[in-house]
Amino acid sequence: MVAIVEVKAREILDSRGNPTVEVDLKTEQGCFRAAVPSGASTGIYEALELRDGDKTRYNGKGVLKAVENVNKVLAPALVGKDCREQAALDRLMVEELDGSKNEWGWSKSVLGANAILAVSMALCRAGAAAKGIPLYKYVAQLAGHEAPEFVLPVPCFNVLNGGKHAGNSLAMQEFMVAPVGARSFGEALRMGAEVYQALQRLLKAKFGLAATNVGDEGGFAPDIKDPREALGLLVEAIRAAGHEGKVKIMADVAASEFYSKEAKSYDLDFKSPAADAHRLLTGDQLKDLFKEWSEEFPIVSIEDPFDQDDFSSYAALTAEIGSKVQVVGDDLLVTNPARIRKALQHKACNALLLKVNQIGSITEAIEACKLAQASGWGVMVSHRSGETEDSFIADLVVGLRTGQIKTGAPCRSERLCKYNQLLRIEEQLQGRCTYAGENFRNPSN
């Protein structure tokens, strides 16, 4: 037994200057720290992120209540327990100490997913240390991969920002480049950085220096409105960097952010102050637009193409382009096994975006991943737009063998710490791993 001797939480700041929860969990082997991220475009079905609501402090976004819940509720219950009991202790926190539920499962609405997850992540680090193995190997064991061949993921770099992540006119949230033709993760990182730098030069020449300002995730945020123009810029940057054919395009539409439930339509110009009914698109019209783009551009993945409840549009798109394009559910699924099962029934998508803070514990995140993988889906591990310097998801993606990760542009330290940790893992494995490459949708085959 390796007993937990202390658990302490504090309020720190994330990459947007908003408060978040950090936890130190101590055993006889040392102190293990974790910090949780937060999103800007959040799905309505995500587990509850507990905020204080005190408008006189951090505009109501303080997390002192969540910190108190760790220190006064979770800590006393965990001290003395074996840190290697990840699943049992996650269940204790989620089902007994919090206990709140909704139609989709455990909602964490009493203690807060941000409180529980911070402890769960720190606990995972302590468990790995107790077993004397790297975090990614411990995650693999927790997932039931006893002797896995490790897979290094394709990094999906968000190089053009729009939506809620940037102050420009672009409705769609992320335009990414994915070096599927690289031979290793290290080479993929180089390719991504070279495309990013080529794009910077291109934007400066076309639109001026202001166009190279960056958004929340390190991508550029030029004041363009047409998604087709954004896609064309990526094609041009890939060509200029000398990586045509080896670097593909991915998009995160985040369509729930510009969907009107009343009008049952999508507004690709939702940031414009002037309302115009003529620019609204039905789900079917938007589907046809995605299909057109997938034929015109080297697009291999589209995330959240429709509203989080528009299962029929998802299913129609997946049926039409799903064999050659990954259709990813983020707000649709919120890393929730119950939502994944519903999507499977509807044949709504063919990939899961895995965000640990959407579900609120490492055990539940692993369960969601395994369900998706067992169903033949792809799985992409993801950061959030409000990030910290915690690199946990780098080890998570290797341990779960999902083959793809998105954690921003090759810019801003809270993004690069994940990519750099993956470089270290690849170096540590020294040939005892493969790079997912073009098999990113199903790297185990």
Swiss-Prot record:
Keyword Lyase recorded: yes
Binding partners and assembly: Homodimer.
Sequence positions that bind Mg(2+): D252, E303, D330
Disulfide bond positions: none
Pfam family for this entry, one: Enolase_N
Binding residues annotated for substrate, in chain numbering: H165, E174, E303, D330, S382, H383, R384, S385, K406
Organism the protein comes from: Eimeria tenella (Coccidian parasite)
Protein name: Enolase
GO cellular component: phosphopyruvate hydratase complex
Chief site of localization: cytoplasm
Cofactor: Mg(2+)
SUPFAM superfamilies: Enolase C-terminal domain-like, Enolase N-terminal domain-like
Enzymatic reactions: (2R)-2-phosphoglycerate = phosphoenolpyruvate + H2O
Catalytic residues (positions): E217, K355
Family, as annotated: Belongs to the enolase family.
